[in-house]
Amino acid sequence: MSNPISQRTARIQQATQTVFEFLTASTFARRGDEPGVSNFAIGNPHDMPLPGFVSALQQSIVPQNKDWFAYKMNEAASQATVVESLKSWRGVTFEAEDIFMTNGAFAALSVTLSTITDPGDEVIFISPPWFFYEALIVSYGAVPVRVKVNPTTLGLDLDAIAKAITPRTRAIIINSPNNPTGVIYPPDDLKALADILTAASARNKRTIYLMSDEAYSRIIFDNQPYYSPTTYYPNSLLLYTYGKPLL
C-alpha cells in the first residue's frame, strides 16, 4: 500500500520528530509544569502581558465596518508606520511597498521561502538552529543545508558558510540575536558574510538572498549594540515579529 501522505509531508515529519518527542514524551514534558521549574525550551514569555498592550488589543479587535471579516491585504498606514520605525530604530531605509505584513514571523518565514525558492534550491541555516527552520525549508521542496557555528565563539563560521555555497544555493537564514545561543553577530562578521554572498551570487550568476530573522532584536542586555545583517547586504529580507518583545 502506498504511503497515505505526500513525500514532502513525510520529510517534514522526519525533520521535526525529535523535537516533538522532546516536547511530548521526555522528562521535560512530564515535569515542565511543576512548581519551581523554569521552561527554557521555547522562547515564550514567562510573565503576563502589560495592561496597556491588552487594552490596545481589545480596542483594535472591534470591527471598523461591515466588511470586517479578516484583512485581505497590507494596509498603507501600517506599512508607513513600519518604515518610520525601521528608519529611526535601525537606520535602515525601506519603501512602504517593501513592507509585507504577516501573521507573525513564522508566517513571514513561510511566505519568504515560498517566494524565493523552487524545488531543489538549497537554503543554508546556522546550527544549532531554531527547531523549525529545517521543516519550513523542506515544506517548499527546498534542500536544508546545516552549517555549524564556530565551536569556540558560537559565532558564524564564515569559511564553512563559503564552502557550503553551491550553484543551487538560493538563501541563507541568519538569526541574530541567535536562538538558542544568544550570540549577537558583530559588524565585521556580517560585512565578511556580505562579501561572501556578493561574490558567490556573481560567480553563480544567481542572487543569494539573506533572510534576517530578527525576532529577538529588541531583547538585548547590558546595553549591547545590535547590528542588523540587512545593513550590510542589499539582497536581504528582514523578518520581524512583535510577539517576542511585547512581554
Write out the residue ranges for each language-model feature.
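Glycine-rich "substrate-gating" loop/helix at the edge of Rossmann-like oxidoreductase active sites
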Residues: 11, 148, 181, 243-245
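Residue-level marker for buried hydrophobic side chains located in beta-strands
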Residues: 210-211
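Walker B catalytic acidic pair
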Residues: 214
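N-terminal small-domain helix-loop-helix segment of the aminotransferase-like
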Residues: 13-104, 111
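Conserved core of the PLP fold type I
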Residues: 66-205, 218-233, 237
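Short glycine-rich anion-binding loops that position phosphate/pyrophosphate groups of nucleotides
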Residues: 43-45, 176-179, 244
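Active-site PLP-lysine loop of aminotransferase-like
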Residues: 236-247
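Conserved PLP-binding active-site segment in aminotransferase class I/II-type PLP enzymes
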Residues: 1-19
